[in-house]
Amino acid sequence: MLTIADVEFESRLFTGTGKFSNSQVMLEAITASKSQLVTVAMKRIDFKMGLDDLLTPLRQAGVRLLPNTSGARNAKEAVFAAELAREMLGTHWIKLEIHPDPKYLMPDAIETLEAARILCEKGFIVMPYVHADPVLCRRLEEVGCAAVMPLASPIGSNQGLVTESFLKIIIEQARVPVVIDAGIGAPSQAARAMELGADAVLVNTAIASSASPIVMAECFKEAVQCGRRAFEAGLGRVQTGAVHTSPLTGFLNQ
């Protein structure tokens, strides 16, 4: 069981709501994934037009919403988006995203740390999306973040665990849950993230852009479960050379 703040999650697969062909496919894929925490961008919600098309189906599915501040270019804009989410959606959970560069969507470490400090002081449950920087993740812990969400590779790239070496350090040092976010493009990559000891993964593009999102969601669900079980069972140590599994010459003496 995974615990973030005071909430327990049976599923360690978190999902998103973007890039699906329509809301029905989105809902069926999320249901198939068994995800219990689903992120939604505040910039996608038109509060003047009502919440039915996107949010009502998610609430009916019983998932917890994790609004995100995607589109914010600095700490001020991110704090505004978080406060709007709390007011309009009734949640103090927030996925903090600040990426002013529209090409690569790399998170701004300085603005993210400042926004995290402000939001934690305001009573938010903050889960920041950041580069795989062990020092930054420690600083975010210190200001009160409930979890950290280091990227595996650029958002939507499906490149996999490009930052694996740094993710290992973050997982080793973290005192809060580590959710690997962004760039996971295949179930095998999600399984690998879990084998490293990540507490959860967040997957959106790889599911939504699949030719069969519902089947792909099921695949990710199973991969995350297997990866976590493998981590808990204990993976064998990687050796630099061959190690025989049985005596090589004993039978010659019989």
Swiss-Prot record:
Catalytic activity annotation: [ThiS sulfur-carrier protein]-C-terminal-Gly-aminoethanethioate + 2-iminoacetate + 1-deoxy-D-xylulose 5-phosphate = [ThiS sulfur-carrier protein]-C-terminal Gly-Gly + 2-[(2R,5Z)-2-carboxy-4-methylthiazol-5(2H)-ylidene]ethyl phosphate + 2 H2O + H(+)
Active site residues of this protein: K95 (schiff-base intermediate with dxp)
Top EC class for this record: transferase
Subunit-level organization: Homotetramer. Forms heterodimers with either ThiH or ThiS.
- Pfam families recorded for this chain? ThiG
Q: Where does 1-deoxy-D-xylulose 5-phosphate bind?
A: G156, A182, G183, N204, T205
Identify the PANTHER family for this entry: THIAZOLE SYNTHASE
Name the pathway it acts in: Cofactor biosynthesis; thiamine diphosphate biosynthesis
Q: Where in the cell is it found?
A: Cytoplasm
Q: GO CC: one term?
A: cytoplasm
Does the keyword field hold Isomerase?
A: no
Designated name of the protein: Thiazole synthase
Alphabetical GO biological process terms:
thiamine diphosphate biosynthetic process
Stated EC number for the protein is: 2.8.1.10
Originating species: Shewanella baltica (strain OS155 / ATCC BAA-1091)
**Chief subcellular location:** cytoplasm
Q: Which family does it belong to?
A: Belongs to the ThiG family.
Briefly state the protein's biological role: Catalyzes the rearrangement of 1-deoxy-D-xylulose 5-phosphate (DXP) to produce the thiazole phosphate moiety of thiamine. Sulfur is provided by the thiocarboxylate moiety of the carrier protein ThiS. In vitro, sulfur can be provided by H(2)S.
